[in-house]
Amino acid sequence: MTTITPIMVKELRERTGAAVMACKKALQETNGDMEAAIDLLRKAGDAKAAKRAGKTAAEGVIVIAISKDQKKGFMAEVNSETDFVARDTNFMAFASKVAERGLAEGVSDVAATLALPIEPNSSSTIEDERKALVNRIGENIQIRRVASLSSDGVVGHYSHGGRIGVLLALDVPNPELAKGLAMHVAAFNPQAVSANQVSTEFVEKEKEIFLARAQETGKPANIIEKMVKGQVEKLLKEVSLEGQSFVKDPEKLVGDLLKAEKAKVLAFLRFEVGEGVEKESQNFADEVMAQVQGNR
C-alpha cells in the first residue's frame, strides 16, 4: 500500500481546496492516486477547485493572424518563463512572426511551424530564431501549441490582452457577428458548439459525480434517475455555445441569435496562456465578462 505523505496531502489540498483530513482520507482510499482522489473529493462535494488538477506554470502570449479576406486564421501560444519576458519587445516580435508565418504557410502543428523559414526564402528557420532568442534573453522560450481555422464564410477572432485568444468559423460572411461570438467564447469558454458535440467522456464523468451525490439523498432509484437526467441536461446547456446566454445580450441564447442571423458556427478554438494553470493573480475570463458588460 502506498504511504501517504504530508507532501501528497498538501498537493491535493492545493489542487482541490478540500480540508486536510478529507484529502488524507481520499488519498488513502485511492492508494495514493492523485487524480482518483480528486474525483473522489468531487463526488463527496469536498473539492472546491478540481480544475487545478494537472497544472504547470507558464507565462507568455497568445498571437493571432487573420488573412485579408478573413477566411483563414492562425493562432499560437508562445511561452516564456516569466511575465516580464512575455512583455519584452523581442519576445513579442518573435511571437508575432510565428503567427504571420504560420498563417502564410497554412501549418497546423508545432513541428511544422518550427521548421518554417523565418522569412520567405530564408535559410534560417523559426526554430533557429527561437534558439537565438533563448540565448539573448536567457529564458526558455517555447511554442506550446498552434492551430488554424478556415471558412468560406468568415473567421472571426478576439484577443484579450494577449492572454486569451479565440478563432471562430462562421458559415456566412458576417464579421461583426463572428467577432461578437469570439468574444463570447473568450468569456464563457464553452466546450462545444452544441450539446450533442460535448465529449461523451466528459458527460459520463459528470454523470457519475451527479449520481454519487444524488444517492446520498436516500431517495428512490427512479427519483434519482430523474434528478441525474435533469442535472446532465442543464450541464449540457451550460457548457455548449448554443445553449449559453449571449454575452452582449443575456436575454438571448446564442442558438436563437444564430437562427435569427441565419448563421451557423462551424467550429471555434480558444487558447488561454498557461491553460491548465490556476493563476492566483487574475481570472482573465471574468475580466473579459466585465469588459463586455461595461461596453454595452
UniProtKB/Swiss-Prot annotation:
CDD domains registered for this protein in UniProt: UBA_EF-Ts
A GO cellular component entry from the record: cytoplasm
Entry GO MF terms: translation elongation factor activity
Localization in the cell: Cytoplasm
Function: Associates with the EF-Tu.GDP complex and induces the exchange of GDP to GTP. It remains bound to the aminoacyl-tRNA.EF-Tu.GTP complex up to the GTP hydrolysis stage on the ribosome.
Record family assignment: Belongs to the EF-Ts family.
Name of the molecule in the record: Elongation factor Ts
Native species: Coxiella burnetii (strain RSA 493 / Nine Mile phase I)
